[in-house]
């Protein structure tokens, strides 16, 4: 069967640039790769055809020979048929590693390249710990002792997984690389070694303490420094305090996620604190002093001027939360709420009625002004009608 024109195979014009050839090749390689079309012989043939066409046209000398003589340039005795040398294999390895994510080797390429360093060494998993603290603890900072279940390196075998007096041997299937290459006709695919499962080593006599895993489950006790000024949702990273790595690999990290309990008095907004304080009608009308709490456990006095209304806010400087890793401190805001008297005695009712009868608009400027505006609104509306 005659070969198809290489430009036709890649779907490009004879004047295609090097970048256009590369784009076309990558697109077709993804479509026809055997791992994406298992058992599809037609896809396998097309994949070979695409590889062959690209290797020829991406090489300046071979392309010039092909443009002049066609496929005859690579027949026996000619310039040499397309093959996959190491330099092309390296390029293909990069392409397929990016496309398929597992470091598959390219057709005819050289030795594959591992993604995790030495075969068998695995980084330990990261761990998460949720820690709830009070607002007072967030204000002052604290050292918290926590206990976490985790996996640590087996002390009996020092993490090797092998019984005392023995040691793991290099996997004979992959030669310690952790991956094997399987030839499929014109190309080769690199996969995780089925014998050692990518570890590069095999344990013939496993440690009885860890059953060959190299790690054992334990509960660890750690001290965590919670700095003053932390906020809800803050994450603290403790490097190397996660699970131990496998077979000498590095340990993972521990992430502590902080949450702050709701406070009965204070609401927080950044470094500022807000506290709602009820005051009596008499204090609001005649003035007075009230005692309010402070987050550090102390108390302070706030002067309430005569005629204070509900919602009035008083600022107390530097009585809020500290700013994390700073010398700055937020403020405390006291918002008053005037309480209406309840359960009045007969005499109290009489006194209030007497006050109401003697009161004028000057005593209630806000309500008097409001009802005056309402009256004017309806009067003007009736006039327009």
Swiss-Prot record:
Zinc fingers typed CR-type, residue spans: 141-219
Domain remarks: The J domain is necessary and sufficient to stimulate DnaK ATPase activity. Zinc center 1 plays an important role in the autonomous, DnaK-independent chaperone activity of DnaJ. Zinc center 2 is essential for interaction with DnaK and for DnaJ activity.
Entry note: cofactor: Binds 2 Zn(2+) ions per monomer.
Principal subcellular localization: cytoplasm
HAMAP family recorded: DnaJ
Each CXXCXGXG motif repeat, start to end: 154-161, 171-178, 193-200, 207-214
Subunit structure, as described in the record: Homodimer.
GO biological process entries: chaperone cofactor-dependent protein refolding; DNA replication; protein refolding; response to heat
Gene Ontology molecular function terms on file: ATP binding; heat shock protein binding; unfolded protein binding; zinc ion binding
Domain J: 5-70
Underlying gene: dnaJ
Protein name per UniProt: Chaperone protein DnaJ
Gene Ontology CC entries for this record: cytoplasm
Annotated family: Belongs to the DnaJ family.
Compartment(s) where it occurs, according to its Swiss-Prot or TrEMBL record: Cytoplasm
Cofactor section: Zn(2+)
Keywords in alphabetical order: Chaperone, Cytoplasm, DNA replication, Metal-binding, Repeat, Stress response, Zinc, Zinc-finger
Binding site residues for Zn(2+) 2: 171, 174, 193, 196
Database matches in InterPro entries: DnaJ, DnaJ_C, DnaJ_domain, DnaJ_domain_CS, HSP40/DnaJ_pept-bd, HSP_DnaJ_Cys-rich_dom, HSP_DnaJ_Cys-rich_dom_sf, J_dom_sf
Binding site for Zn(2+) 1: 154, 157, 207, 210
Functional description taken from the UniProt entry: Participates actively in the response to hyperosmotic and heat shock by preventing the aggregation of stress-denatured proteins and by disaggregating proteins, also in an autonomous, DnaK-independent fashion. Unfolded proteins bind initially to DnaJ; upon interaction with the DnaJ-bound protein, DnaK hydrolyzes its bound ATP, resulting in the formation of a stable complex. GrpE releases ADP from DnaK; ATP binding to DnaK triggers the release of the substrate protein, thus completing the reaction cycle.
SUPFAM superfamilies: Chaperone J-domain, DnaJ/Hsp40 cysteine-rich domain, HSP40/DnaJ peptide-binding domain
